[in-house]
């Protein structure tokens, strides 16, 4: 290339950055001060030239700093005029904005201006004053502070010093790079054995001009459900993506999403950015392809993006499938018809039927000859094939991902490689995505993957060398697969292979040195297996290191081998971090480096010679100490050496202090009897917790349970074994220890407490957990002598003792089944043996039993908290039912109100432990979509009358509980709180009415049974038609409305809102109702005699979204009109243009209402003229709105005038599509936002996790199952908002069994699912209602 008329070499290893750095070095400046013009020197580039993709033959580049010095610029206006193109070029390059570039360059003009004037005898003060005056009044500098010249002149020495330093550093770096490039060119070819490149796919492309649309518009209008049925294949679109929006075809069977390879999505993740449209098409073959065992579909990735004045459409085709031009043209035809239906009109077949391989013009045809000028003649270019995808292999090698990434980031020789950290780097991905960039190849995207030949079907056995011989490989051979996913020209593949293999040769040479460096900090397992965690690696590089001898083989030179009398075989179980024995010399060296050592034994125990022990090899536990010995030699050796996290020398009363200093031992938990096995602990005995539970409470390792530095001891505390151990454990936790040492008396005492829990009000509390049991069964269970199950009766015990209880249990446990025969009630327990897991690992927070219908509602925390551990012991215990034990804290440090050495079993809700457990519990709940927190309900309970009162007059007497165990109706009376209550009012029965609630946890109230049920099983009653029932609605649902006399009182006291009736409110015959909250509960109370016609208003959210959309598109419309105004008034100054536009084109009309068409497929600016303009003036609905919009436009005009001016060339609005609600919607597809959301959809589908067992609206395909519908059979389901759409779509499914009767299952909160026959054969639908309307699930058998 010629640079300013002189030869400038561009090397194969050059990148865009290194070329620019070397050009700056030649011109003795730095890259940001380069000004690119063509060889004639008069046509300026609007941005930095791309030296990689389109290297110019000749270019002129100016050093703007030097240019300022040589130009005789007399004012800021001349400065701005001279360098206006450079400001644009610098802003478009991305290093800085136009404003920042102007300010940066302005400081050099200021320095040069004052310096030249000073040389001509003009004082510094006068020059600064001239510049300040021009900044105040002139065009060029009015965006800057008036003191700008004075500040720059005072800082000139530092500015010039920094600049010269940067120039010098750039020249040094450029010289190093040029030398390195020359050396790399001379590097011999790699000796690594690699296979030839195998082409797997070709990239086919064609262009479309006169398309008149944007990517978001294409996304909106694309016919995603269109099917192309050819002779050999069936083409269907799976997904369409742009700007991080994903449109997903809802008509494709959900199982097909399992076939989508997430790596393909990640590889093409650039399609998530703006201005690129990505389409995945599924090609389903109609017959088995040659060499294939099945008719599995192939997924084709299509990319659509602007390319100068045309639209470039690219897609990759497998050469083994699409080996004819006819196949490719069918796909091309399908794409054009799908993407541009508005351009083609009706007779698109006539336009596309011929000569698809060459150029063609496609004239749009519209009904009745009406042609739309927005959609001109569509021109489709010829089909081109120049890019390829494929793979080749490096044999008998593997690469370490972490080491290879290090070289890419830190080794200059690897500067032609880079990774895209936004999408490509992940610990979970074994494949590494890399980009190779040189001036010859442009950007090459490829991936690296370590593989091993496992079978003789491996592709390497099929590949031959250039001379026709098979590769020398066998089963077990390791190799690196290199897959090229994008390369501009397939002729550059040999160049890519040669240079990449040279880099691999460098990698293998440098591998060991880098691996050794990393092994100082992290453990890396060779073989590409990734980084392994290692707790005790020293991460402090400044800390002195001791050369530790390499590990010996097991049995050689171990502690047990060196001192067998002291270290018995079970020692390692007692001390997790053993010390090492060191010599006198090594001990001295360790002490000099601040490591401690101890001698043991020092009292001639066992006639042993004392040895020196050190713990320097444990980063986290460097202090040697002693621990109590309970092994077989404990009579000889009271203590054993061990390593600790803290210094035991400083802990008074520790085993260390006792042995070496003669201090008395401080009592600790070790003085209590302590069970360290999974067995059930006896009454009043302590036991350790499973590791995972202990860690939750703050323990680091279960092996440290009795270490002297342990200050957060949590244990399980035993109760008497029995059926009521749950009640016993909670009672002891709150301090009820009556008869705690007398078994029979304690059991009798606890049994009496249990009997009190069988009252009707307590039974109501348990209905969320006993939802699947008859109330009489629950009552008999509580009264029986069967096991009292914590996961069934948790809420009863919580209310009785006024505590909140957290349950913990083993990961393996039991299944409790109840059974009633005549008057006998029994339960059986299917136990899973706990010995199947190592005891130290199991344990978890536990949830009570609850229904899969709806949500499980949690109650707010009470003041006092109890932790209970449930388990079945070990096989040695051979128990019949689980045992409950209290989790306690052994206080080892003084706490408020509690002495050191005491046991704490009752916690407060603000204790640190409770906050930690509550946080973890909340995180656990996040994994259950059907669990939510309930409201705090401040009612006072009166046990004599079994009622709840709130103190304002509301009295709750009964509750209705639905099939899932949630309270949905409260039956209440109103007793006004007044001192003037008359005798007549006292004698009269108070008003009795029904409060319909949101699902809440059951209250301590009697349960009201629903006695009336609809017996007509053959009549399908749509949810919206309950008002047509011949009998009053109250006869069906036992809902009593309030009288009009109570309306005002309830509205005033509880701030309720009066709502007009809607026939959608099927619970109460379209009655008006009060809506709001009573004591934290969302309620609805129906009003008698107030039937009104339906009134549907937009929701607050919908109104908000509409206003947001109006605001953003109005702003862009005004900006577009202003840009047009600038174009037609070039003779005006910026200020004059703005002022005249405001006067001539803007008008405020407070009565004007904007009406936005939500269904524009392509939002041309001209379509909005009638919406925003009247008599050629833009209408603003308020003065404030006009001020806000015009202020922002003024700021843009001042800062980016040229860009604002260019907006007049646009025809399509950019901001029309911004939210999910802005696009067209249809029941046959759904739209999501974000790559992670879509990948989660794909991965969940792969794992079968889209199985719903709750009723809630959803988009796209799901699986659905309910125990109440055909015995829990799993169905494929779609959700619709219309019964007609649901029936129509199911009838169009050719796979439904039309010999079966049609059934609709209506779900209501009282009866659950009820089945009705309908006159549509094979149709199976579930109907349900949520807050925003009715929904219908179509069910299709999966087997």
From Swiss-Prot:
Matching Pfam families: DUF5757 (PF19061)
Broad class of the protein's primary localization: membrane
Coiled coil: none
Keyword annotations from UniProtKB, A to Z: Membrane, Transmembrane, Transmembrane helix
Location(s), subcellular: Membrane
Topology class, membrane: Single-pass membrane protein
Record field: transmembrane: 432-449
GO CC annotations on file: membrane
Record-stated family: Belongs to the IIV-6 295L family.
Protein name: Uncharacterized protein 295L
Species: Invertebrate iridescent virus 6
